[in-house]
Structures are given as C-alpha cells and as structure tokens.
C-alpha cells in the first residue's frame, strides 16, 4: 500500500476554508418540503480536525444535496474514533461509521479488543475510503531516528476508543513492550498531539491517518517535527500475520521539513454499517457518493486518488451490505 498524493499540501488556510465549506454546506441547505417523509441517518467519525470527520462530512454533503427527493437527512457526529464507532453501531446508536480495517476485522470476528464482547456478525461493509499509514512524528530535537529510540520517552499512544490506540497496543505487544516502556504514555486526541509536541510536553506521537493530514501538517510546519520510519521485525510479523495490514510509504516532501520518504505500514479507512440498516438507506447513501464521485474526491486531499474499483474490495473486513452490493452490481463494479 503506497500513499501517493498528487497535490501537495497547501497552507493551513486551505484546510480552514475546506472545513468551513463542508460545514456551510451541511448547515445552510434549504429545508426539504414538509410533505417529504424524512429519515435521519448518523455517521460516526473521529475528531473534528481529522480525515474521518472530513469523510463523514463529504458523504453527508452529497446525501443531503438531494434529500428533498429521497427523504434522507444525514448528520455527522464527532466521536472517539474507530472502536467507539463499531461499538456504537452495534448498540444501534449510530447508523454508519468510519473504522480502520483492522478494527472492523476484530469487531466482526470478536478478536483483539472485542474478544470479551464476542463477534459482531451483523457488521457490514459499505465501501473502503483511503489508505491510512501509521505515522510516527517526533520533536525535531528529540534525536528519534527509529521507533526503538522512543523507549523511555514521552509518547502519545492515542485516545481510548480510537483505532490508533488499538493499533498501537497491537504493535507494542508484538514488540514485547508495554505502556510502561515510555516515561509517559499520553492519551491525547489527534487535534491535541501536534501542539503537545511543539510545546515540549511530549516527544512524539503515533497516528493512523490518511495523508495529507492537518494534524501532521501543523507540527511539521510550526516546529519542524520529523516523521520517523516504522519498520523492522515486529512490523514484518504483523503484515505477514494479518490480512488488514500492508507496508506503506509516505511520499517525500509531502510535509514541510521532511524531504525524504517515510517507510511504515498501515490499514485502510472503511465505511461500515449494520445489517439492521435498511437496504434502501444504504443504497441511497452509496449512490449519492458514487454518482457524484468527482465531487467527493475534491472534498479532501486524502481522497484525490481514490478509485471506485478499489473501494468496493480493498480493506473490507466484513461482508458487503446488500444495499451497497446492489448499487455496485448495477454499475458493473462487482
């Protein structure tokens, strides 16, 4: 899996304007006619500065554009991330959500962090979105050349409920490490870890994200933070053992002060739902995205190189929902 982004990351103002555009589109649309019977669907995402929130916003924007016709109103919820989304869909409190492919696999099969809860056989895939290389970022003056150099350092392992945290714990276990191997294992959210690095509160952080990402752009621009390659026997073992992992490369020069490419591994962001969500609802959501695919790709730089043929198969860790399957078959994608 190689992350290749054709358009370099611009200034932060571009991110602010893009986010504002999505928010404005979601909030300013004219109400649907009173005669239309409204159905509300909610999408669980992640922190408001992350790519998951942008993905949910992009999907809802396209769904809501024609809600007067199909009667579905879509809303985005900022959440703790992948694990939270999977659990909340299972509880029936979210209709759809974005989850890492490894989290989806574990939730469906009752493995990893879901072992105690047991399998969730009703989890269904809708489509995959973007690749998510695991990214290690360190303070410029921390002298961190490899992940092993972080032993004894102050390191952010991800907030509870996030896919980042789940993947971090799996990597540590494979390495034979625990959280006690760090002098501080902080649990900051993605919109907090960049400033913590620049303020000298932590030495680095681990983050699974689609690139380019504002939460990595900020510390690399503001204080010259460095991306650290994540390779070695533990990574090779994980990639060989689990179908949802793959080696990945973050392109050279994607972020300021990081002229070389960064070798790592990662997962895929996937859009999921429950088998209990009606086929017609999922069909409508999928149709809104793929009938307006060029518009969808423009709503975040991480979506720029997406291809429908890949999104119907890559990284899907649960069976495809019948509503999604119907649309993809109609379009010859299956």
Outline where the language-model segments fall.
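Bacterial N-terminal signal peptides that target proteins for export
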Residues: 2-21
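C-terminal segment of classical bacterial N-terminal signal peptides
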Residues: 24-34
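Short, glycine-/small- and polar/acidic-enriched structural segments
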Residues: 37-151, 159, 227
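Bilobed "Venus flytrap"/periplasmic-binding protein-like clamshell domains
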Residues: 40-66, 128, 132-199, 294-297, ...
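Sec-exported extracytoplasmic/periplasmic mature domains
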Residues: 60-69, 90-94, 109, 173-177, ...
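Pocket-lining segment of extracytoplasmic ligand-binding domains
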Residues: 101-103, 112-113, 142, 178-272, ...
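Ligand-binding clefts/hinges and TM-proximal coupling segments of bilobed small-molecule sensing domains
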Residues: 153-170, 244-313
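An extracytoplasmic/periplasmic, membrane-proximal ligand-sensing/linker region
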Residues: 192, 199, 209-227, 237-240, ...
